[in-house]
């Protein structure tokens, strides 16, 4: 049993639970675990586990790129002539500065704690209150951050959760070459994904992953399952299709993976995941996961603060498909 739950062990959860108990136990637990909690918050989004991580992003940070071209020289000749051309370039991660503030009336908070303890006593809830309480907050931060990673569009005055930094689709729209942008017509998702696959340069095919929204992935499975000419593919790939919403595109070595951030966007994205960067702080005291009781307001309060941003190292490698009706 956890420290905060230990603190109220033996107290009748209905009659004896007091504000003073929670004022000390829960903030202490969160303070002790603050580093792990802020890390969990910024990496809860699904796509953060797929891409390269850049830490120390407290302001704009450059990703340094090196392009090398080697030309053979004539070894039978005397002399020394440079046959290597190298170009150094940069792409910049421009992070957004995000905070999540929450407050609870002390009576409502105590009622929630008491109800949770009753459920634990009855065996229907196993997690200690503080873990259950915090994990639910982290889960929802992750869900919103996942959408922002793909769909974000920075605004001078943010009004929604997508307004704090430019997401991957905004960057792709601006920087991916026109030749790599494909309009996908019809209603056959299998054919649409194959069209994107066919546009991937041959020298990049082994490292590229095709990302889709979950509804597009389900349509892919439908188009394999209910099409008589493809039903054998669905049978052979059945185990893959039902695990992590990812599968190898039949007849290829290329992974197709569903990510929540592309839901309802009608986009199919082929890219090299290691060339997509997710930037976070991770090193300074600007990152915060704090919980306390405000005596002045007579409220429990919480603050989570962090920076986050994304960038594509090489937009020319990306294939961006847009599904049209």
Describe each PLM feature range.
Residues 106, 113-195, 322-325:
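Alpha-helical scaffold segments that mediate packing/assembly in large oligomeric complexes
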Residues 96-98, 131, 206, 296-300:
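Residues at beta-strand starts and edge strands
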Residues 28-113:
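Assembly/oligomerization interface modules of large self-assembling protein complexes
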Residues 190-228, 234-235:
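Ordered core of a single globular domain
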Residues 102, 130, 210-213, 295:
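Active-site-proximal structural scaffolding
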Residues 43, 142-151, 206, 230:
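Intrinsically disordered or highly flexible coil/loop and linker segments, enriched in small
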Residues 106, 214-216, 306:
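Short, flexible loop/turn elements at secondary-structure junctions
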């Amino acid at each position: 049993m956890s420290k905060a739950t230990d603190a109220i062990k033996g107290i009748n959860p209905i009659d004896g639970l007091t504000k003073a108990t929670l004022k000390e136990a829960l903030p202490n637990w969160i303070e002790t675990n603050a580093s792990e909690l802020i890390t969990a918050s910024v990496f809860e989004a699904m796509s953060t586990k797929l891409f390269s991580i850049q830490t120390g992003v407290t302001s704009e940070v450059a990703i340094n790129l090196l392009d090398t071209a080697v030309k053979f020289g004539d070894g039978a000749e005397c002399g020394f002539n440079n046959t290597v051309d190298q170009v150094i370039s940069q792409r910049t991660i421009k992070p957004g500065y995000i905070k999540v503030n929450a407050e609870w009336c002390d009576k409502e908070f105590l009622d929630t704690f008491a109800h949770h303890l009753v459920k634990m006593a009855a065996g229907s809830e196993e997690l200690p209150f503080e873990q259950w309480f915090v994990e639910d907050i982290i889960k929802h931060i992750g869900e919103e951050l996942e959408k922002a990673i793909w769909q974000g569009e920075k605004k001078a005055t943010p009004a929604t959760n997508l307004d704090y930094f430019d997401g991957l689709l905004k960057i792709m729209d601006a920087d991916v070459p026109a030749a790599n942008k494909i309009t996908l017509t019809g209603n056959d998702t299998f054919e649409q994904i194959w069209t994107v696959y066919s546009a991937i340069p041959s020298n990049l095919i082994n490292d590229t992953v095709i990302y889709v929204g979950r509804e597009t992935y389900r349509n892919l499975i439908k188009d394999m399952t209910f099409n008589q000419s493809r039903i054998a593919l669905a049978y052979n790939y059945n185990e893959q299709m039902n695990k992590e919403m990812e599968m190898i595109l039949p007849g290829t070595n290329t992974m197709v993976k569903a990510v929540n951030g592309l839901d309802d966007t009608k986009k199919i994205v082929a890219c090299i995941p290691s060339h997509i960067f997710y930037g976070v702080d991770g090193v300074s005291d600007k990152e915060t996961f704090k919980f306390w009781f405000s005596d002045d307001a007579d409220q429990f309060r919480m603050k989570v603060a962090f920076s986050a941003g994304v960038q594509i190292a090489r937009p020319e490698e990306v294939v961006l498909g847009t599904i049209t009706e």
